[in-house]
């Protein structure tokens, strides 16, 4: 690519595309968020018009790990952590904690295709490692995947928020705290999708070599059945998405580079984590399922870091199905995510 990444021969670069996430408006235009602006494009992402989101922008700085959804009724909901209120990250090794760390999460919505935004609300003050997913269920509930840091010792936990009112108000789920010791420990950065039987399925990043899963039978209000999956994974987030074909699409960083089983481990010292783990972020792989995750196609690497890459990570992917079977993949444009913007086609992976 123009940024120095290797991409599979059936994958095409989309030069200059914003990082996303993207939603499609009722008239076919694209909408995303960048900085504190809502950006709208009528030419499939080549040029953009910007609208401010906040009446008082000095109080807000939207973190790059933002999430967006446009509901079937036309509401656009944005979930984000506010960097302007980020405070007190002071990891103390003797405590294995940062007791006063704060990075609040907010929701805000637009009812006029992004021109104006309303109903801004803070959902928690706790340190939010990342907000990673935002979906609408078949019953019209909006479910957002977030995080809340726990203390004594410091570790991360996952929570979701559910809105039955198109983003006007929210109910928090049980907090999923599976333990851990360290500033990158615990369960984190979950992705969520609805299964054919109506339940929600969550895949959580862990330091334990695989994604862990949970299920909810009540639109994300209560999560249960926490257990490891058989999907090997680095300590990095995946993204699960239901395609218009009905297949599930998963993109993630595998625990080991393709063809290797000797990737060096990190952590295990109780500072970053209590267990040594893979931080492999040099490749993004995809696979698809026709039976709600019971079986999957063989994983395929779609992009890889090279010596010439502008960034040495490819992680924190975003997925947008621009047209049926045409999937745009972007990474979170930052050092930890990399700078990938490509399109791939479902037909090439089934």
What are these regions (language model features)?
Residues 1-350:
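Asp-box/BNR beta-propeller blade signature and adjacent active/binding-site loops
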């Amino acid at each position: 690519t123009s940024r120095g990444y290797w991409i599979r021969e059936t994958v095409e670069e989309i030069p200059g595309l914003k990082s996303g996430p993207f939603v499609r408006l009722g008239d076919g235009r694209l909408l995303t968020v960048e900085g504190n602006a809502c950006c709208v494009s009528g030419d499939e992402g080549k040029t953009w018009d910007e609208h401010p989101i906040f009446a008082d922008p000095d109080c807000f700085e939207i973190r790059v790990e933002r999430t967006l959804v446009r509901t079937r009724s036309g509401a656009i909901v944005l979930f984000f952590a506010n960097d302007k209120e980020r405070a007190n990250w002071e990891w103390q090794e003797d405590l294995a904690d940062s007791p006063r760390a704060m990075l609040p999460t907010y929701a805000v919505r637009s009812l006029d295709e992004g021109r104006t935004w309303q109903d801004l609300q803070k959902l928690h003050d706790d340190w939010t490692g990342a907000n990673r997913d935002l979906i609408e269920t078949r019953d019209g509930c909006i479910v957002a995947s977030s995080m809340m840091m726990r203390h004594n010792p410091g570790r991360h936990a996952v929570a979701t928020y559910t809105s039955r009112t198109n983003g006007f108000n929210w109910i928090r789920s049980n907090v999923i705290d599976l333990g851990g010791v360290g500033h990158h420990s615990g369960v984190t950065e979950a992705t969520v999708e609805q299964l054919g039987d109506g339940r929600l399925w969550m895949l959580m990043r862990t330091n334990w070599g695989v994604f862990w899963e949970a299920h909810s039978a009540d639109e994300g209000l209560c999560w249960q059945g926490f257990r490891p999956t058989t999907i090997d994974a680095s300590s990095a987030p995946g993204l699960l998405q239901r395609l218009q074909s009905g297949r599930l699409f998963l993109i993630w960083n595998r625990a080991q580079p393709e063809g290797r089983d000797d990737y060096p481990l990190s952590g295990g010292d109780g500072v970053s984590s209590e267990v040594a783990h893979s931080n492999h972020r040099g490749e993004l792989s995809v696979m698809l399922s026709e039976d709600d995750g019971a079986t999957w196609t063989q994983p395929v690497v779609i992009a890889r870091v090279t010596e010439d890459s502008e960034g040495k990570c490819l992680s924190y992917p975003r997925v947008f199905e621009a047209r049926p079977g045409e999937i745009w993949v972007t990474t979170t444009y930052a050092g930890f995510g990399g700078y990938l913007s490509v399109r791939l086609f479902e037909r090439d992976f089934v």
